[in-house]
């Protein structure tokens, strides 16, 4: 496939560590769509989550280093983790607005033989596929029908907040659009931009499991056969903790969970093995075999 778009690629710690299937499917889908992702050399943690709460300035330093590395490559930065998107974008905004950290960050970058002029835009892959690649190109790659597959499009709480640059903060539709383009049927999912519980699973598990239970119940009540995610932490909570939710609340959830790039990859004709789908905890094979059909 001829390259049509080129970006620096920031996998982030979650994808690099526990979510290899997200990276596998991302690489395959991007190759099919002519998106060249050049992994950022020597990238480091973005400073998201707990680090930002403990020492905000040092967290921004981590993000600023990644932005400076991307600027050296003269390409905008694509991420697949909304937490990384939020943290990197927040640092970008702070530096552009001349925040109290700007001088300290500039000095730290200089000590590492780096500098940052603010030319890099950080984008989520979903945004790139929908707004740069577009519907026609996506539809042209489809080889398998997802006949009647009802999906709950789950955005999580960080893709659109706090900046609202990707879509509406409360009622995003960008993932719904993409899922329709590849032949799936997004169901009404009122909690699609609500928190999954995040790191509360480590600090206040009862509250975290309650939030996850609400998401699973909402998806099930609205007829979803699987949940489609764009965030590695959301994916882990929604899939991995279903057993814990069932024990705590007496429920019986067994809802398969897939990354949006995995579902795209299936529609594009890639195998489950290539996309890392058979590595999941809640098997989706029976569901996918029921709905997948070769395009006539």
Q: What is each of the regions a protein language model found here?
A:
Residues 1-296:
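Iron-sulfur cluster-binding electron-transfer modules in prokaryotic oxidoreductases
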């Amino acid at each position: 496939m001829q390259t049509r778009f080129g970006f620096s690629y920031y996998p982030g710690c979650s994808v690099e560590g526990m979510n290899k299937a997200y990276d596998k499917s991302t690489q395959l889908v991007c190759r099919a769509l002519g998106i060249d992702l050049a992994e950022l050399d020597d990238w480091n943690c973005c400073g998201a989550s707990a680090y930002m709460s403990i020492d905000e300035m040092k967290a921004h330093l981590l993000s600023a280093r990644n932005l400076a590395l991307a600027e050296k490559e003269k390409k905008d930065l694509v991420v697949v983790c909304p937490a990384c998107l939020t943290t990197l974008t927040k640092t970008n905004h702070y530096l552009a607005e001349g925040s109290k950290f700007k001088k300290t960050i500039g000095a730290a970058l200089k000590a590492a033989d780096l500098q940052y002029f603010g030319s890099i835009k950080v984008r989520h892959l979903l945004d790139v596929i929908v707004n740069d690649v577009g519907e026609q190109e996506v539809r042209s790659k489809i080889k398998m029908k997802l006949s009647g597959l009802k999906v709950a499009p789950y955005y999580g709480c960080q893709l659109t907040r706090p900046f609202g640059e990707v879509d509406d903060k409360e009622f995003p539709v960008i993932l719904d659009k993409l899922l329709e383009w590849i032949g799936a049927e997004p169901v009404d999912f009122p909690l699609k931009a609500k928190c999954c519980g995040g790191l509360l699973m480590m600090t206040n598990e009862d509250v975290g499991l309650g939030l996850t239970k609400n998401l699973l119940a909402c998806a099930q009540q609205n007829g979803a056969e699987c949940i489609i995610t764009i965030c590695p932490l959301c994916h882990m909570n929604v899939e991995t903790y279903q057993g814990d939710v069932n024990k705590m609340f007496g429920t019986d959830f067994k809802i398969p969970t897939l990354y949006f790039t995995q579902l795209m990859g299936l529609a594009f004709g890639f195998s489950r093995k290539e996309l890392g789908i058979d590595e999941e905890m809640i098997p989706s094979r029976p569901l996918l075999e029921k709905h997948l059909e070769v395009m006539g």
